[in-house]
Amino acid sequence: MVRVMATGVFDILHPGHVLFLREARKLGDELVVVVARDSTVERLKHKPIMNEDIRRFMVESLKPVDRAVLGHKDDMYKTVEDVRPDIIVLGYDQKFDEKEIEEECRKRGIKVKVVRLKKYGDSDLNGTRKIIFKIVDRVDDLYAKDRNS
């Protein structure tokens, strides 16, 4: 059985996330998704809109996903040690170096192949920031009726 591991924030689920997870699932028999902890997201990106438990629940509810787990708070490789994947899948925009991941895993006794997926689609809803900006741009239109009531 080939176990695939994918990782991400998954703050506001969008079509890009679904496509990423579908493609990751095709690479093996089981897909385990690691959802970044709130503290990790705040340190590396921004304060998440959805908390880690909600994000994990949402991801685990997706059809391609067999299991979703929260990442380790201090050491991402501890999660890799727990999951023991055969393949780690990276999205086109994830800022990790494939060779560095493979080397660190090798040092920890884990033989893993790291695969970076290509960009898929170019929808204006294929990114959390794009969705947030679209909502902000349209908030007046969306709630104008409520304000006038």
Curated annotation (Swiss-Prot):
Pathway: Cofactor biosynthesis; FAD biosynthesis; FAD from FMN: step 1/1. Keywords: ATP-binding, FAD, Flavoprotein, FMN, Nucleotide-binding, Nucleotidyltransferase, Transferase. GO terms for molecular function: ATP binding; FMN adenylyltransferase activity. The keyword Translocase does not apply. It is an enzyme of class 2 (transferase). Disulfide bonds: none annotated. ATP binds at V9, F10, H14, P15, G16, H17, D93, Y120. Its EC number is 2.7.7.2. It catalyses: FMN + ATP + H(+) = FAD + diphosphate. GO terms for biological process: FAD biosynthetic process; FMN metabolic process. Pfam families: CTP_transf_like. Its cofactor is a divalent metal cation. InterPro entries: Archaeal_FAD_synthase, Cyt_trans-like, FAD_synth_RibL, Rossmann-like_a/b/a_fold. SUPFAM superfamilies: Nucleotidylyl transferase. Coiled coil: none annotated. Belongs to the archaeal FAD synthase family. Catalyzes the transfer of the AMP portion of ATP to flavin mononucleotide (FMN) to produce flavin adenine dinucleotide (FAD) coenzyme. Homodimer. This is FAD synthase. It comes from Aciduliprofundum boonei (strain DSM 19572 / T469). The lineage of its organism: Archaea, Methanobacteriati, Thermoplasmatota, DHVE2 group, Candidatus Aciduliprofundum.
